[in-house]
Swiss-Prot record:
It comes from Drosophila melanogaster (Fruit fly). This is DNA replication licensing factor Mcm5. It comes from the Eukaryota. It is found in: Nucleus; Cytoplasm, Cytosol. Acts as a component of the Mcm2-7 complex (Mcm complex) which is the putative replicative helicase essential for 'once per cell cycle' DNA replication initiation and elongation in eukaryotic cells. Core component of CDC45-MCM-GINS (CMG) helicase, the molecular machine that unwinds template DNA during replication, and around which the replisome is built.
Length: 733
């Protein structure tokens, strides 16, 4: 509990005794052991691990040494135990020992480099991390390991490690005063004890700091949030302030999942006074923070740092047997929200989204996303929100948000002013915190258009660029988006076509699969659905079954299997499957492969390159489910089928016509003809009855739906405007 009851005054102890000498001898012995560990620790092939690493780092200008705690335990268990229990004192000795060893192994140094730099000791451990909620007062001043997400990062500041002070009255200099590490400052002495004959005593508080005689290091403060896996239902995630110095600065950005090795410390709590607003320390109360001595970052964004990252060899063998079974795809889709009746293709699409395709880095440095985005459009009461809630539970990393309560800054990132330092700090939003997982956005249609536009970059490039308050940076948002939206009229109206939805083509084209979910009135289906819902409610009254139903996979196994597949498999498209997909793509673009299905016409809907990439991602996810290195013809066929029943079917209903690549050439010509006639019909600044226009075009044998589509498109472009309770059309430009 160091630093808890310090008086905050400068003092000098002039009464050293035998105990002080014994302590000094003991510290020298500890330093000797640390030096011996760095010099002599070797692995089986007689590779001197730390000695060689220290020399290589020092010569390359990296003045730090990373130590694995397991190696120190193997060398001297007592020494490792002391480092765990008294890290502040022992880290200082360890760094002195490393500096002396570095001095020996790098001598003789070149001219102008004779000065010896300080060495920073960084620690790492394979121990299981502690939850932030479990850090209590008995952990203070001890070495702990925690996991979490970085949500805010400050800029780089300087902190003095050694400083000199001077008396204003008598000019006495007290040099090389040691400043404790961490967020605790230094209390200047209140009195000057220098006595000079014939001079009055120096006044109170005469000392000032000499900046040019101080030795400083870089430091940065971070804000760590506990992992969503460990947050109890209905509670707010806990936060902890982190203090990083020297080589640990600027290693992470908001959104990174990290493992932190550090010293759980305390600092004074300031309370603003009523008189002048200045903060005054509250007596006896201390706020916790973590002085970081080691950081491990999950740089791949695959959720390697989560509750489900510890997979045993037995579980791994079980997962490989599951992948080898032929029905794993069906079993996984059946296990996805089993209480929801039907929606089999939607469940299969969401299963593919949970596993995702393979992220590719091209030779020119560009990236191709592997995450799959899915949009559910349709009637209320079709279990869209329930599916989103289940995905939040089953995905290893997931963030659930509602469209009405989400702003652009809340979804992407924001720049805020730190109330303590008054500096700007960056905080990541939902899509940054879900890096490597899934963002579930309910009520997607209720979002403001400006907020929806903010996630365009995050959905396709999977980055979020910030240029605010002098901070210009890019954050990762490598996550899938599962969105649910209702029709603009409440229920889906087949006669209205495109008017059912109010989305721009730019956002629609970023979704790999778009499902139109309709509440179909069918007696036999309604009877089956009613039975299923009644059974769900009746079974909920009984005690919960200990095992899932036959063929289903338990939630924990499902979650671990997703994590295992995402971290151990990155399939690519095979050459044969690529050739097949290429030929199918050409057929779909040209319209030669589609037959007329309806009585009037049912022409093929061409797809763009963006939709072709969507089919590739779906194929790779199907291969990943089976832990196969290549996506084959079988996977491509299923991917094309899913794409057919989702986006293509939605496009054929006319609901997505006008979006990128979602209109036939013949339809487009008809739309252009109607638009030209409309513009000739009435001049800019005039208004005409919408009913009269419709009747006029119907007499010319045009479909009402097609005419309404043109009017709706022109209104969206800002060329037309509804007036007088939507009865009149006014031409703006």
């Amino acid at each position: 509990m160091e630093g808890f009851d310090d008086a905050g005054v400068f003092f000098s102890d002039n009464f050293g005794g035998d105990n002080q000498q014994d302590a000094q001898i003991n510290l020298q012995a500890v330093k000797k052991k640390y030096k011996e560990f760095i010099r002599t620790f070797n692995e089986e092939n007689f590779f001197y691990k730390y000695r060689d690493t220290l020399k290589r780092n020092y010569l390359n200008g990296r003045y730090f040494l990373e130590i694995e705690m397991e190696d120190l335990v193997g060398f001297d268990e007592t020494l490792a135990d002391k480092l765990n229990k008294q890290p502040t004192e022992h880290l200082e000795i360890f760094e002195e020992a490393a500096r002396e060893v570095a001095d020996e192994i790098t001598a003789p140094r070149p001219e102008h480099e004779e000065h010896m730099h300080d060495i920073q000791i960084l620690l790492s451990s394979n121990a299981n991390p502690t939850n932030i909620r479990q850090l209590k007062s008995d952990c203070v001043s001890k070495l702990v390991k925690i996991a979490g997400i970085i949500v805010a990062a400050s800029g780089i500041s300087a902190k003095a490690t050694r400083m000199s002070i001077q008396c204003l009255s008598c000019s006495t200099v007290i040099p090389n005063l040691k400043v404790n590490p961490g967020l605790e400052g230094y209390a200047l002495p209140r009195k000057c004890n220098t006595e000079q004959a014939g001079r009055p005593k120096c006044p109170l508080d005469p000392f000032f700091i000499m900046p040019d005689k101080c030795k400083c290091v870089d430091f940065q403060t971070l804000k760590l949030q506990e992992l969503p896996d460990f947050v109890p239902q209905g509670e707010i995630p806990r936060h902890l302030q982190l203090f990083c110095d020297r080589s640990l600065c600027e290693r992470v950005v908001p959104g990174n999942r990290v493992l932190i090795q550090g010293i759980y410390s305390i600092r004074k709590v300031g309370k603003p006074s009523r008189r002048d607003g200045r903060e005054k320390a509250v007596v006896g109360v201390r706020a916790p923070y973590m002085r970081v001595v080691g950081i491990t970052v999950d740089s791949e964004g695959a959720g390697a740092i989560s509750r489900y990252s510890n997979i045993t060899s037995d579980e791994e063998e079980h997962f490989r047997r599951m992948a080898a079974s032929g029905d794993i795809y069906e079993r996984l889709s059946q296990s996805l929200a089993p209480s929801i009746f039907g929606s089999r293709d939607i469940k299969k699409a969401i299963t593919c989204m949970l596993f995702g395709g393979s992220r590719k880095r091209l030779p020119d440095g560009l990236c191709r996303r592997g995450d799959i985005n899915v949009l559910l459009l349709g009637d209320p009461g079709t279990a869209k929100s329930q599916l989103l809630k289940f995905v939040e539970k089953v995905a290893p990393i997931a963030v659930y948000t509602s469209g009405k309560g989400s702003s652009a800054a809340g979804l992407t990132a924001s720049v805020m002013k730190d109330p303590q330092t008054r500096n700007f700090v960056m905080e990541g939003g939902a899509m940054v915190l879900a890096d490597g997982g899934v963002v579930c956005i309910d009520e997607f249609d209720k979002m403001r258009e400006d907020d929806r536009v903010a996630i365009h970059e995050a959905m396709e490039q999977q980055t979020i660029s910030i240029a605010k308050a002098g901070i210009t940076t890019t954050l990762n948002s490598r996550c899938s988006v599962l969105a649910a939206a209702n029709s603009i009229f409440g229920r889906w109206d087949d006669t209205k076509g495109e008017e059912n939805i109010d989305f721009m083509p730019t956002i629609l084209s970023r979704f790999d699969m778009i499902f139109i979910v309709k509440d179909i009135h069918d007696e036999s289906r309604d009877i089956t659905l009613a039975k299923h819902i009644i059974n769900v409610h009746l079974s909920s009254n009984k005690s919960a079954p200990s095992e899932p139903a036959e063929g289903e996979i338990s939630l924990s196994t499902f979650k671990k299997y997703i994590h295992y597949c995402r971290t151990h498999c990155g399939p690519r498209l095979s050459e044969a499957a690529g050739e097949k997909l290429k030929s199918r793509y050409v057929l779909m673009r040209s319209g030669a492969g589609q037959q007329e299905k309806a009585s009037d016409k049912r022409l093929s809907i061409p797809i763009t390159v963006r939709q072709l990439e969507a089919v590739i991602r779906i194929s790779e996810s199907l291969a990943k489910i089976r832990l196969q290195p290549f996506a084959t013809d079988e996977h491509v066929n299923e991917a094309l089928r899913l794409f057919q029943v989702s986006t293509l079917d939605a496009a054929m209903t006319g609901s997505l016509a006008g979006a990128e690549g979602f209109t036939t050439e013949e339809d487009q010509e008809t739309l252009n003809r109607i638009e030209k006639q409309l513009k000739r019909r009435f001049a800019i600044g005039s208004q005409v009855s919408e009913q009269n226009i419709l009747q006029d075009f119907l007499r010319q044998k045009y479909e009402e739906r097609t005419v309404m589509k043109v009017i709706h498109t022109m209104i969206r472009r800002g060329e037309l405007q509804h007036r007088m309770q939507r009865k009149m059309l006014y031409r703006i430009c």
